């Protein structure tokens, strides 16, 4: 299963969910869905915006874990 490590990167950047939401242009509700792993899919455009806002690589945000 793919796990999002958005909270880890947010902590490293000392950024709140609200700040990230504003930078990326995603609602808090949708960002929370991504953060909690409840999202079924993520658009490449969204991943690109997250990486730009958090100054990181996609591999910093995504991690595969065995079920």
Where are these regions (language model features)?
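Short, charged recognition helix plus adjacent turn
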Residues: 8, 28, 33, 40, ...
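The alpha-helix within a helix-turn-helix
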Residues: 10, 21, 51
